[in-house]
Swiss-Prot record:
This is Mitogen-activated protein kinase 13. A motif (TXY) lies at residues 180-182. The modification Phosphoserine is found at residue 350. Serine/threonine kinase which acts as an essential component of the MAP kinase signal transduction pathway. MAPK13 is one of the four p38 MAPKs which play an important role in the cascades of cellular responses evoked by extracellular stimuli such as pro-inflammatory cytokines or physical stress leading to direct activation of transcription factors such as ELK1 and ATF2. Accordingly, p38 MAPKs phosphorylate a broad range of proteins and it has been estimated that they may have approximately 200 to 300 substrates each. MAPK13 is one of the less studied p38 MAPK isoforms. GO terms for biological process: cellular response to anisomycin; cellular response to hydrogen peroxide; cellular response to interleukin-1; cellular response to sodium arsenite; cellular response to sorbitol; cellular response to UV; intracellular signal transduction; positive regulation of inflammatory response.
Length: 366
């Protein structure tokens, strides 16, 4: 039985995958694919702008996949900040829940990501501008009650004008390994997330910003651990082995005795670690790469750092109007129930004009 599809759609094979697109999106071209779906670029004929369209990979294969698809859709719908990727449109070619198998997320198109350009030389001015945007995006995400947990160069999208948007926020859950067998990059992850050794809060993302900023300034990954223990060893070489006050906060007994077994060592001199960085950049790194989560800067505190004085526009440092509501995710729903919720969200979606900054830095990526 052939499925009934909506009118105004056309089919196209993109990178050996069947896509269905509304006729408003022209010239689709493959951009990339990953564990959770594939992305193509297209031109929105109504605006002439290039967009990115993501087709989720088998969103209704299981309850876990369906729940993750629902979360991704809701997170994107919730975001309205120039430094956070948000939703321009969402569509399905299906005409009812009964024949609903696929849906597509339409987002702003960004030329590249930081991972792909980490080898280039960044001036401190460029690092400053990119880190300022990361922190603005994080302040907004955190104000919605979301923690990224897996911030790394690969999910920081940038365009040729050095404008940055955070991707894949709030999706780094325990389901990742279950769904893909994929082990997340630990190099940018805060020690409390890697080791689950103490409570963690939104400053896990600030640690990641510190690691990324350090790499942009030096051209080298700061903590390149081969495994979890090696990662901790690399971190402690820089932060020093903490004293009794810190050890008391550790919940994990094994971590506690391991740290206590190490000879105490002082924190490295960050001016020697980052010899080409300005004193202000060194001071910010020192405060972001703080082992104790209770002493590490928040995104709002980091934005107020003197390093960003020349750039700051508090009007752009906005917060979410309301917290992200994930109450439904605590329910154990069937695939069909998740499908109904997603279909309803798509049917009720109304695009909101994206609010991007009016100012231009005049800076080019390369």
């Amino acid at each position: 039985m052939s499925l009934i599809r909506k009118r105004g759609f056309y089919k196209q094979d993109i990178n050996k995958t069947a896509w269905e697109l509304p006729k408003t999106y022209l010239a689709p071209a493959h951009v990339g694919s990953g564990a959770y779906g594939a992305v193509c670029s297209a031109i929105d004929k109504r605006t002439g702008e290039k967009v990115a369209i993501k087709k989720l990979s088998r969103p209704f294969q299981s309850e876990i996949f369906a729940k993750r698809a629902y979360r991704e859709l809701l997170l994107l719908k919730h975001m309205h900040h120039e430094n956070v990727i948000g939703l321009l449109d969402v569509y399905t070619p299906a005409t009812s829940v009964r024949n609903f198998q696929d849906f597509y997320l339409v987002m702003p198109f960004m030329q590249t990501d930081l991972q792909k350009i980490m080898g280039m030389e960044f001036s401190e001015e460029k690092v400053q501008y990119l880190v300022y945007q990361m922190l603005k995006g994080l302040k907004y995400i955190h104000s919605a009650g979301i923690v990224h947990r897996d911030l790394k160069p690969g999910n920081l999208a940038v365009n040729e004008d050095c404008e940055l948007k955070i991707l894949d926020f709030g999706l780094a859950r325990h389901t990742d390994a279950e769904m893909t067998g994929y082990v997340v990059t630990r190099w940018y992850r805060a020690p409390e997330v890697i080791l689950s050794w103490m409570h963690y809060n939104q400053t896990v993302d600030i640690w990641s910003v510190g690691c990324i900023m350090a790499e942009m300034l030096t051209g080298k990954t700061l903590f390149k651990g081969k495994d979890y223990l090696d990662q901790l060893t690399q971190i402690l070489k820089v932060t020093g082995v903490p004293g009794a006050e810190f050890v008391q906060k550790l919940k994990d007994k094994a971590a506690k005795s391991y740290i206590q077994s190490l000879p105490q060592s002082p924190k490295k001199d960050f001016t020697q670690l980052f010899p080409r960085a300005s004193p202000q950049a060194v001071d910010l790194l020192d405060k972001m790469l703080e082992l104790d989560v209770d002493k590490r800067l928040t995104a709002a505190q980091a934005l107020a750092h003197p390093l960003f004085e020349p750039l700051r526009d508090p009007e752009e440092e906005t917060e979410a109007q309301q917290p992200f509501d994930d109450a439904l995710e605590r329910e154990n729903l069937s695939v069909d129930e998740w499908k109904q919720h997603i279909y309803k969200e798509i049917a009720n979606f109304s695009p909101i004009a994206r609010k991007d900054s009016r100012r231009r830095s005049g800076m080019k990526l390369q």
